[in-house]
Amino acid sequence: MAGKFELKTGASGKYHFNLKAGNGQIILTSETYDSHEGAKSGIESVRKNAPDDGNYERKTSSKGDPYFVLKAGNGQTIGKSEMYSSESAMENGIESVKTNAPDAAIAETAG
């Protein structure tokens, strides 16, 4: 099953999206956007930048949990991962984003 972007409108009228793997797990969460167009542009940026390993910044939370940030070519953050239990799990998450993002469909939902 292919991955998909879920584009959501929040109660505040702002937009964000999640990239879900084929198994339904969220593998990337976007920043918040003021407009629908901005969020769709963010999705296109994820599609464009996801295949390049150099666009991933690997980090560790204050609690020691690994996670990653996907950045656009201009250095702007376009998505963050969940917290992982290990670095190998985080690397698997990065590979999943690389695999799923370029061809993922967009599904729009409220909430």
Per-region residue spans from a language model:
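A structural feature that tracks compact, well-ordered secondary-structure segments
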Residues: E6-K8, K14-G22, I27-Y33, G42-V46, ...
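Mixed-charge, glycine-accented linear interaction segment located at domain edges/termini
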Residues: M83, E95-S96, P102-T109
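Short glycine-rich, low-complexity/disordered patches
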Residues: A50-S62, D103-G111
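Acidic, aromatic-enriched beta-alpha/helix-loop junctions
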Residues: H36, K40, A50-P51
